[in-house]
């Protein structure tokens, strides 16, 4: 095949990935024109709809997109990939790698990363609510007589969206990219039409209008910044979804279609307001002629459902990562596609999200009321991403500290400006994502600390495995036929389940395997590096299986690899799995306060069973109880 053909294939693949990325990565930021400008000129802000104010706000929107999306995320943050994977947890794992595990900065970076992940969930409950609601509110423009159905229709759409999650979205997901391409082309065309009617709006490209607006209104303009940030909702997705599509396709989509379309639409809305300030009632839907209003409502609703789907899938992926990294208790994870390994479904997360989202929709009743709650989660995550990226630049890339200070300084000024403006909206609704984030942060840190204490207690009371096996072989118990697999969290200690089995049954299987699963700080582990097998002699084997934080442990796959390495055969239904069922008992021992220990014990009790998490046949499992005081 010629170099030209290779180049053509690569180009085709790049374009295909870019279109697919448009359907997943850019749904959130792509639907922000539905409500962003309307919220910026909310009557509560008291900003007059004068030409200078309109030009000033549009200029702020334009430069926010250019500086934060086009430069910060696309050019800088997306360089900080963890073996190709992005997102706040991947960035946290990357930033921790060169640091001393016991240093204070390590604890700070870990806490920041966890809090950033928790704020994502605060964003995840608002995005579907405000996006779908703002799209359905287009009925108030298209067919005012149906305006009373906005809330019921929104609720029905959201319930249907979460109901289909268990069946997977791989089939319809192929349509997401083309539909979102149509969406971006449509909003760009609507913008161009009105820009042609009021070309004066183009002068908003000049940052003078942004600075003039800020200096003229000062305090009010700072409040407006809290609404301007709504144009950036979903910017974090560019980085978080990098592992699915790669940096090049996302950059291509951002620069060629997404950013130009967004800018044209916002400028079009600004032009419409210059022509008719009363259009602030709903500037997005009033861009369309009356005959196109209803089709635009339909297209908007589909686009917001796609945007919501991306956030929901992101919540599943983030939960899976957090479980593997040890910050969240085990949960049942179902794979909904045999072909796409990333297509997962987490029932607990799905139904909790739906419950909270429905409460939000019913409680806030309109996208206008909900907009005040939206920006704070986004801006908090932006600040955290910037700080973690700074650590990576200095500690991992070894960049010049002065250069890093200059780059990060500019980004932090922008991020903290947006975050501070959104703190002013805590009373109007910002308390919601902050409250969700704070509650989840408490639970995740309690789980992480609790597991650390359990490991310390277990290690203190544990028996080293190597000398124990030597003694066992020197004075062997009665051997019985079959295979026994002991799952253990520490491959250097004797599993408690083995001690109980020897104590009560006084037998050892002719083939005994000690299996440990380890999660590394990279997204994926190469297949040839995943499983190591140590032969301890006399049918005893120590197996260590390493997984990345984006992978799900698979006992069956590990046994297949052991079979290949050691020329052994396994019949899953003829194999016994021995597990230790830990009962955590809160005490006044040093570690955590007693009430946090009780919370940890409750989480531990309600974690998914190992049989469900590791996909082990329940009728092949022997659970032996052990009590751990913390």
Curated annotation (Swiss-Prot):
- Kindly give the membrane topology term recorded for this protein: Multi-pass membrane protein
Q: Which Pfam families match?
A: K_trans, K_trans_C
* Subcellular location, record wording: Cell inner membrane
Enumerate the transmembrane spans: 17-37, 51-71, 105-125, 144-164, 175-195, 218-238, 255-275, 283-303, 344-364, 374-394, 402-422, 428-448
Keyword annotations for this protein? Cell inner membrane, Cell membrane, Ion transport, Membrane, Potassium, Potassium transport, Symport, Transmembrane, Transmembrane helix, Transport
* Primary location class: membrane
> What HAMAP family has UniProt attached to this entry?
Kup
Q: What is this protein called?
A: Probable potassium transport system protein Kup
